[in-house]
UniProtKB/Swiss-Prot annotation:
Recorded topology in the membrane: Lipid-anchor
UniProt-reported outcome of changing residue 26 to I: In PARK7; does not affect protein stability and degradation; does not interfere with homodimerization; decreased detoxification activity on methylglyocal-adducted CoA
Gene name tied to this protein: PARK7
Outcome reported for the amino acid change (mutating residue 53 to S): No effect on mitochondrial translocation neither on deglycase activity
Organism: Homo sapiens (Human)
UniProt note on tissues of expression: Highly expressed in pancreas, kidney, skeletal muscle, liver, testis and heart. Detected at slightly lower levels in placenta and brain (at protein level). Detected in astrocytes, Sertoli cells, spermatogonia, spermatids and spermatozoa. Expressed by pancreatic islets at higher levels than surrounding exocrine tissues.
Modified-residue entries (Phosphotyrosine), positions: 67
EC number: 3.1.2.-, 3.5.1.-, 3.5.1.124
Annotated site residue numbers, Cleavage: 149-150
Protein name: Parkinson disease protein 7
Active site residues per record: 106 (nucleophile), 126
Effect of residue 51 to A: Disrupts dimer formation and strongly reduces ability to eliminate hydrogen peroxide
Keywords: Acetylation, Autophagy, Cell membrane, Chaperone, Copper, Cytoplasm, Disease variant, DNA damage, DNA repair, Endoplasmic reticulum, Fertilization, Hydrolase, Inflammatory response, Isopeptide bond, Lipoprotein, Membrane, Mitochondrion, Neurodegeneration, Nucleus, Oxidation, Palmitate, Parkinson disease, Parkinsonism, Phosphoprotein, Protease, RNA-binding, Stress response, Tumor suppressor, Ubl conjugation, Zymogen
Phenotype for residue 179 to T: No effect on detoxification activity on methylglyocal-adducted CoA
């Protein structure tokens, strides 16, 4: 069976942990992850001044699709940049239309709202993004640390990054693989 494939869209101002932890955990699970720079292949400055080098530009990564999951990290500026991107809208619409998984964390889910993705779904966000996410009544809000409703998977923030990543692994590769990946991470149960 071919490896599952993930596209992580990295925008300037993305939250570092919400980017790197899911990438690392998915790769541990054998998922082929492409970190795609929204503005190109140049290094991206994240919200806490950590610089991440994308694997590809979003334009090039899009040509290699489709992906089993599209992942949107949070960070206020990162989420704003994702929300304002026509390329992100196109990728999310294609992913939704082909019934592919879409995962977003922290402020990242606000890009779903901006691009009219997953309306009617139960979602969660960082507490400070809740009001923005609920504007217009297009979603049902959950206080869960990770919420999966059909093909929309959302999470709350940096402190839920491991749970978010493991939920993606479980959705793509099953509970057994997620448990195998989790065990050596020495996470608190």
């Amino acid at each position: 069976m071919a490896s599952k494939r993930a596209l992580v869209i990295l925008a300037k101002g993305a939250e570092e942990m919400e980017t790197v932890i899911p990438v690392d955990v998915m790769r541990r699970a054998g998922i082929k992850v492409t970190v795609a720079g929204l503005a190109g292949k140049d290094p991206v400055q994240c919200s806490r001044d950590v610089v991440i080098c994308p694997d590809a530009s979003l334009e090039d990564a899009k040509k290699e699709g489709p992906y089993d999951v599209v992942v949107l990290p949070g960070g206020n500026l990162g989420a704003q940049n994702l929300s304002e991107s026509a390329a992100v809208k196109e990728i999310l619409k294609e992913q939704e239309n082909r019934k592919g998984l879409i995962a977003a964390i922290c402020a990242g889910p606000t890009a779903l709202l901006a691009h009219e993705i997953g309306f009617g779904s139960k979602v969660t966000t960082h507490p400070l993004a809740k009001d923005k996410m609920m504007n217009g009544g297009h979603y049902t809000y959950s206080e869960n640390r990770v919420e999966k409703d059909g093909l929309i998977l959302t999470s709350r923030g940096p402190g839920t990054s491991f749970e978010f990543a493991l939920a993606i692994v479980e959705a793509l590769n099953g509970k057994e693989v997620a448990a195998q990946v989790k065990a050596p991470l020495v996470l608190k149960d």
